[in-house]
Amino acid sequence: MSPKPSKNIKLESLLEKNTLNVVFYNDSFVKAGFFAKIMSKWDAPVFYFDFDLLYSGYVTAEEISLPKNLTILSPDSDNLIENLKSVIDKISKTKSLIVLDSLNGFLNLLEGKSDAARLVNSFVMLLVSSAKDVKSCVIVGSLSKLNDENEWVLYNTGRHVLENDHMTKIQLTQSDNEIVAKIPDPDNLILEI
């Protein structure tokens, strides 16, 4: 039996509470399903940076329909800066949803650069600062786990995940083939998706 939502907390209102939101997951298919559900509820423009190409694959295979308000960007080393500039210009003028899928893929794209983690953090903060005035929302997916010190770290690399006092943290799991989203705090509040 799937866990019941706590206190009728709607995920959409929680996401809009802070401009920056980080979604922790350990199953990429659950993450793709979660993002598909969230994006289907947004009327505003959605910009999806698909670094791991899983979501794009689902769209190409027609497993997931492409909402009319969704722009999928598949950044590579040649077009990353142009994509970021274009999206920053748009999200600074119009309320939007920005999905970075995923932090792991973003870091992989910049692999080999000695300052890759600093660059990724800077790009994320640039998106967030551009989004703030028009109340846009940035969601960063992160294939992560809790380490022995109870800190979120990326799978494979063990790098620490972005931490900020002004961001919402959401943990995804699956129960009885249902996606479960919860706030990983002492109360472990279950969110209604």
Q: Each predicted region: which residue ranges?
A:
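Pre-Walker A adenine-sensing motif
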Residues: 1-18
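Phosphate-binding/switch region of NTP-binding enzymes
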Residues: 133-193
